[in-house]
Amino acid sequence: MKKAAIITIGSELLEGLILNKNAQFLCQELKNLGYRVVKVSTVGDDLISISEEVKTLLLKVDLLILTGGLGPTQDDLTRDAVAKVLNRSLKLNEELLSKIKEKIKKYHSEIPQNIERQALVIDGAEVLDNPVGSAPGQLLTVDGKIVILLPGPPRELIPMFNALKDRLRTPDALYQVVLKYYSIPEAVLEDLLKDILYSQNIVEVATMADHVEGVRLRLTTHMKNKEYLDEMVKKILDKTGEHLYGVNDEKMEEVVVRLLKDRKKTLAVAESCTGGMLSSLVVNVPGASEVFAGGVVAYSNDLKKHILGVREDTLRKHGAVSKECVQEMTEGLKKLTGADICVSISGIAGPSGGTPEKPVGTVFIDIFEHEHITMRYNFTGDRNTIRTRSAMMALENLRKYLKGREKV
């Protein structure tokens, strides 16, 4: 198996000012491409330190990836360090400089004087296009080894690395499928599938669970066993397909928006304890404007009454966190927006406000098109966890409703 190493560059990483998300992403991706990552190091913005690390690791690995230090400032030293170790010159690429300037002009009225540094290319390097930012990457081949320079911001690095994956894939590459579920507990899912998952030794099985993505069943094997894994997935879906919301990188909100488009339905949401979180998830999806009418954050009882038409009598008898309240919230929202489907959420996120009858974590979610589908939940966790789980469960219920489930 080929070996790889990663050098993440930036004093801000050493000082703990930002998380090293690039290392996590690259380690996962390189494993899937058939590399064994033998070292991940973090180096500050220092020419000697970067150079020494590059020199040392080039003796040990087949692939070396450096992230960060490709900006225009004097402390962006990655290009200089790699050129120094390889004893190659840095040359200004005028064509590249013009492209960088054109990109900057779209967002800024003035072009920084030091921008030329981003157009310095190591002799013999292939320039890698950055579709998001202004700092291009570079790729070099050195005695059969590959050296790749990528920018530090993950939103720039990820698409640039993804564009290289086909070129970097090795004979030891892995094939992986991730199946995502939300409303089924991890233990229940595993029990349903144990005869399929654990009666073989060809596919590596891992389950992970959190309050954002739910339960993820990760299935991994070597590329030569792709057909075996695909057949295994079919058997799994025969048993659990109704619970599945996504595969691999699919997000719940993306699935819901796609279903709304397919069914030509519009959506509006009324939120209390989630404070706009559900609306935010929906509008994060490109093209959501085709189906999303809008949202109302009615945190106080006054707004619930005056904007959504919740009756004073309902609030007095049942409280804001109740089946009756969320149903009146969706009814009022439908009158207000005219959306086909309305969803409302009201709950107690804590840490205070709970009672014996309605402890912290009590949440009501209502879906209303022609009739009400109302669910009560008792979530656990801190305030942010309860709010996140509430928004995600609203999406899960909506997904099931749009798929035509009798129950959500």
From Swiss-Prot:
Gene3D superfamilies: 3.30.70.2860, CinA-like, MoaB/Mog-like domain. It holds the Pfam family MoCF_biosynth. InterPro entries: CinA, CinA-like_C, CinA_C, CinA_KH, Competence-induced_CinA, MoaB/Mog-like_dom_sf, MoaB/Mog_dom. It comes from the Bacteria. SUPFAM superfamilies: CinA-like, Molybdenum cofactor biosynthesis proteins. HAMAP family: CinA_B (MF_00226_B). Belongs to the CinA family. This is CinA-like protein.
